[in-house]
Design a protein with these regions (language model features):
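Juxtamembrane transition segments at transmembrane-helix termini in multipass membrane proteins
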Residues: 1-10, 21, 57-70, 93, ...
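Residue-level signal for the membrane-embedded core of alpha-helical transmembrane segments
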Residues: 34, 88, 92, 147-150, ...
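Hydrophobic alpha-helical segments and helix pairs
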Residues: 84-123, 127
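Hydrophobic alpha-helical transmembrane segments of multi-pass membrane proteins
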Residues: 81-88, 142-146, 159, 220-229
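Membrane-embedded or membrane-proximal helical elements that form or frame transporter/channel pores
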Residues: 64-89
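Residue-level signature of transmembrane alpha-helical entry/exit and packing/kink sites
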Residues: 29, 33, 75, 79, ...
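Interfacial aromatic "cap" segments that immediately flank transmembrane helices
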Residues: 13-43, 113-139, 151-202
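Alpha-helical transmembrane segments of multi-pass membrane proteins
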Residues: 41-55
Length: 256
């Protein structure tokens, strides 16, 4: 396996280069990335099947008051279970993938369990940081929409920073924003592509009634594949973070 560190330190990579290098990393350590995807994905697949959450219909939500009424009157226990589990396991997944990507750019291979063990050690700061992030984004989306979307882009490195730079809370959020600002539209394009791809994949995957064997099989297969794609996209974001961090710090040293 080649070392990618020098490429990441040299300059800001193009989007295609980030996708290509990320795929190489994904392929070289596929088994362990697959394990992380399944360890973090299977519990959500099962709870969603056994405790179907209430689905938000955007067409029925015209005002903030409509959202509050929907939340009070229609949200079921499945919504709370799946929301919390998805949030928690997504943090574990991002932290674990960040650890694996960092060692792999230095030509080292580690296991999924090694990465998850390291993630558990920083999970509390990451949860606190994620909670602060959600509050900021929620108010941005609730009252202004566009600023909320801007915050999502600016803070996209937050969990990577918690994992790899031992920084959390507001400091991690500020750190992420400082790295993203010079490449905001690049980050926006990447996030937009990821969201678009995942939604198109879900819509286009074959389906059947949920109460049939075929329906359960299609649901399970689509979610497994979706979590694999999601793992690949998280590798891209982790690599993007490392690239921006290396280049930014190098520029600061040159300036000094």
């Amino acid at each position: 396996m080649p070392s990618f560190r020098k490429e990441l330190e040299k300059k800001d990579l193009e989007i295609l280069d980030l996708f290509t290098i990320s795929f190489s990393i994904f392929r070289y350590n596929f088994f362990n990335f697959f394990l992380i995807a399944m360890i973090c994905g299977i519990p959500i697949i099962l709870t969603t099947a056994y405790f179907p959450p209430t689905i938000l219909d955007p067409l029925k939500i015209q005002t903030f008051e409509d959202f509050i009424n929907w939340f009070k009157n229609e949200v079921n226990e499945g919504f709370y279970i799946n929301t919390f589990l998805s949030w928690f396991l997504d943090i574990i997944s991002i932290l674990s993938i960040s650890f694996l990507v960092e060692v792999m750019i230095n030509k080292k291979i580690r296991t999924a369990f090694w990465a998850i063990k390291k993630s558990v050690k920083v999970i509390l700061p990451a949860i606190i940081t994620s909670f602060i992030y959600m509050i900021i984004v929620f108010f941005g989306l609730a009252f202004f929409i566009i600023p909320g979307l801007i915050f999502v882009v600016l803070f996209m490195f937050t969990n990577n920073i918690c994992a790899l730079r031992h920084t959390w809370g507001i400091d991690a959020i500020k750190y992420s924003a400082s790295l993203i600002k010079p490449k905001f539209f690049k980050a926006l394009f990447m996030l937009s592509f990821i969201v678009f791809f995942e939604n198109v994949f879900i819509i286009s995957f074959p389906s059947a009634p949920a109460d049939t064997r075929e329906g359960l099989l299609y649901y399970f297969l689509s979610r497994v594949l979706l979590y694999l794609f999601d793992t690949y996209f998280k590798i891209i974001i982790a690599l993007f973070f490392l690239n921006r961090d290396f280049v930014s710090n190098s520029q600061k040293l040159d300036f000094d």
